[in-house]
Amino acid sequence: MAKTKSKFICQSCGYESPKWMGKCPGCGAWNTMVEEMIKKAPANRRAAFSHSVQTVQKPSPITSIETSEEPRVKTQLGEFNRVLGGGVVKGSLVLIGGDPGIGKSTLLLQVSAQLSGSSNSVLYISGEESVKQTKLRADRLGINNPSLHVLSETDMEYISSAIQEMNPSFVVVDSIQTVYQSDITSAPGSVSQVRECTAELMKIAKTKGIPIFIVGHVTKEGSIAGPRLLEHMVDTVLYFEGERHHTFRILRAVKNRFGSTNEMGIFEMREEGLTEVLNPSEIFLEERSAGSAGSSITASMEGTRPILVEIQALISPTSFGNPRRMATGIDHNRVSLLMAVLEKRVGLLLQNQDAYLKVAGGVKLDEPAIDLAIVISIASSFRDTPPNPADCFIGEVGLTGEVRRVSRIEQRVKEAAKLGFKRMIIPAANLDGWTKPKGIEVIGVANVAEALRTSLGG
């Protein structure tokens, strides 16, 4: 009898080794190597492979291939359609990740209910809840649709058989880390199980043209659990994020083969489920305390939509040898960089000051155009001088203190004017080449010192 062979696979990065190691050479993680048995391919599989090689299609010139634009299937959640690129594409495999309890299952259950109807049937497969638990959650959301079918199963073979037998219009698998194939020795959620189960679901989606949504767990760092292999295999990767203590939830696309990865959908968690936020700028600014030192407003582009958000800063003398720099919703390295610019180019003595910054509403911002608002908030708190509450700030700040040009300035200014702001501080390079809306004064500044004089009077 032949000896059974095994290999050790890192559960963080997928690195393979013939022997166990405490530290993975690939990613440096400790105690992540798990033993998995090497299974030989059966003779019938090799025969089938050789047969498929003989019958493979011949290469065709790209100009001779006929295509047809199939309409996307839209849900009743416009924000969900926006992030997907306009709706659900037939035959697509969509991965949704997020922290535990953030609302992934709630979102997909609502989407399933909206997609199901007289002509569409949806199969919701839960590996974490029984059918009764899923029904209780559906009752809380007011979902009672006979075209929505629920299955509690984790065996990939039974799941595949159920899809083949029912032939639904849409499928949801919650979650991929609970699904397993019985002929693989490793535990559910391991690299081999996730790879093989995802490959099987992808095969079903592509051959039958069924859109499949799969839920993925995230690690404590916030990324999809396991190696990047799962994200490479699927067509679309969505992250559902938000603060536990806030009602707002944000859906972002980090990979999308059928649309933009810059779009963002905003939802609010209520007792009846998730509802879309149609005017996020107004929601984020409704609790703003106008006239407070350390507060400024900026217009950030999230995909094709400008969103006005409040950036708050608190600067206070440090009680320790090294001052603290903390930021929520903004990269703390950017905060340190901009504080260094204020010290060197403007002369603010911030080396002995603690700095605490946050974006109100739990939004995460990463575009350079918010730099000027961060600088204004820091200087305003340090001088204890509030900026004009009717001012809005846009601009990227360079290391020499210059305020650099940003994109889509006209859309940003129009959004600020729509919400009642009277003055817009923008880069001087952005003043020409577009139509300025009525009712708002647009002022161009060339550097940080000029921006501070304009907004804080000194």
Curated annotation (Swiss-Prot):
UniProt keyword terms in alphabetical order: ATP-binding, DNA damage, DNA repair, DNA-binding, Hydrolase, Metal-binding, Nucleotide-binding, Stress response, Zinc, Zinc-finger
Q: Which domain of life is it from?
A: Bacteria
For this protein, the record's SMART domains field holds: AAA (SM00382)
Keyword DNA damage attributed: yes
Annotated InterPro entries = AAA+_ATPase, DNA_repair_RadA, P-loop_NTPase, RecA_ATP-bd, Ribosomal_Su5_D2-typ_SF, Ribsml_uS5_D2-typ_fold_subgr, Rubredoxin_2
| Disruption-associated phenotype | General sensitivity to DNA damaging agents. Increased sensitivity to methyl methanesulfonate (MMS), decreased survival after UV irradiation in transition and stationary phase, decrease in transformation with chromosomal DNA requiring homologous recombination. Increased sensitivity to mitomycin C, H(2)O(2), and nalidixic acid; a further disA deletion suppresses H(2)O(2) sensitivity but has no effect on MMS sensitivity, suggesting radA and disA might work in the same DNA repair pathway. Partially suppresses DNA damaging agent sensitivity of recU deletions.
Recorded hits in SUPFAM superfamilies, A to Z, give: P-loop containing nucleoside triphosphate hydrolases, Ribosomal protein S5 domain 2-like
Recorded GO molecular functions are: ATP binding; ATP hydrolysis activity; ATP-dependent DNA damage sensor activity; damaged DNA binding; zinc ion binding
User: Motif RadA KNRFG motif residues?
Assistant: 255-259
**Sequence positions that bind ATP:** G98, D99, P100, G101, I102, G103, K104, S105
Q: Where is this region: Lon-protease-like?
A: 354-458
Annotated GO biological processes are: recombinational repair
Its assembly, as annotated, is: Interacts with DisA.
User: What does UniProt say about this protein's domains?
Assistant: Has a putative N-terminal zinc-finger, a middle region with homology to RecA with ATPase motifs including the RadA KNRFG motif, while the C-terminus is homologous to Lon protease.
Family assignment?
Answer: Belongs to the RecA family. RadA subfamily.
The protein's name in its UniProt record: DNA repair protein RadA
User: What species is given as this protein's source?
Assistant: Bacillus subtilis (strain 168)
